[in-house]
Amino acid sequence: MATKEKKELNPRCQWTKFAVATILYLLFLVWVESWWGLIVVPFIFDVYITKKIKWQWWRESPNDATRFIMSWVDALVFALVAVYFINLFFFQNYVIPSSSLEKSLLTGDYLFVSKVSYGPRKPQTPLTMPLTQHTLPVFDCDSYIEWPQWKYERAKGFGHVELNDIVVFNYPAGDTICTAPQYQAQDFYRLAYGLGEGAYAQTHGGYLPNLSKMTLQQQRDFLAQMYADGRRIIDSNPSEYGHIKARPADRRENYVKRCVGLPGQTLQIKNRIIYLDGKANKEPDNVQYSYYVKLRSQMPLELMDELGISMEDITSLNTSGYLPLTNASVKALKAHKDVVESVTLVNDPTTWDIYPLNGNKGWTRDNYGPVWIPKKGATLKLTMSNIAIYERPIRVYEGNDLQVKDGKIYINGKEAKYYTFKMDYYWMQGDNRHNSLDSRYWGFVPEDHIVGKPIFIWWSHDPDHSGFSGIRWSRLFRFVDNIK
């Protein structure tokens, strides 16, 4: 013990520790380009050299209980600060909560997500409890304090988001939520529009007007009224919906999807196939679509396991129903003629809940666009036919006031015929194409929402099986880049 204390007090040893710690810290400051951090250097000097501040005062306390309790507090605080720092700048854990990326990434996959692949964001909401996204467990309250809010900046990374990368990002439409637990995960805007349109239909014989017969200004005014009415319904029913609350960009729910469109590209979906600048983009190997399956008898559990059909997928299936299937699964299912009567691809003509919600484009999830994806520094001509698509990036993500009056567009009080974007945007979709809430429903993902890149699956457990039988051994430490 005496030898250890002597070593700790050895001036040469202390100066060496100080030099190493300071060099590493200065390199970190160079990387994140944050010179405010230099104010910490005198404190590092004090820890190793001058020791004027009693950083561990409790060690000298005569009270055993004080020393015991404070030693645990010290260890806990150090651990939380270390975890906060590592998660913020280097990597974090992410678990796949739904089947939107199946069969590429499965429900129950735990991902190692790298922040340095695309460069970590500097703190935007710095006063946040480590190991939480937005809510404190048990207490069910915010795990962050909204003040201060720092502007978006990103340190340099090893690369940029590339086409077909699987990406973790903050859910863009999560900027506004209902605080009632059963509604927090829902798209607030789809909920508000749906409630407003439902209320309108109730007072008009169950029908909505034919938007295609309206002018673009009339369409816009009608849909704006539907949203306002829906929001009013939510606001006036706190017992059902809770309160309407805004969340900062970095405190919104984390999503994981595949990037299928890059800044500056023109995307169009034709008969389920994604085209970029007129060329078909390769589908993921395990892309899934919904099929209507008619059975002759109940599907055996062995066949479900063989085809990778989860209980989440089959909840609506009795003797007939809908299943998300890969091409290989469709062929295998059709081969079991003793169980399966027919398998038919589902064509959903629904247009009302497709982005943009404030404009009538007549697009569906399988036939969408064309739509140009905004690029930083690129200038777009604004028209009444495209303003519904780009209003959200201009107004919400880039912080401008946008108004449309008498067919004219005003940005920050001035008539605008062009707009130059301040950020890059991306188009994200799930590989489970008919069971994924993605850019087709809520639009572009701005660059300041990008969290990181999944590197590998460090753990995987099938939620349909318990104990060791649910461990997917073949997926452990599988690299995500190898999942195409």
Locations of regions flagged by a protein language model:
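Extended hydrophobic leader/signal-anchor segments used for secretion and membrane insertion
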Residues: 2-484
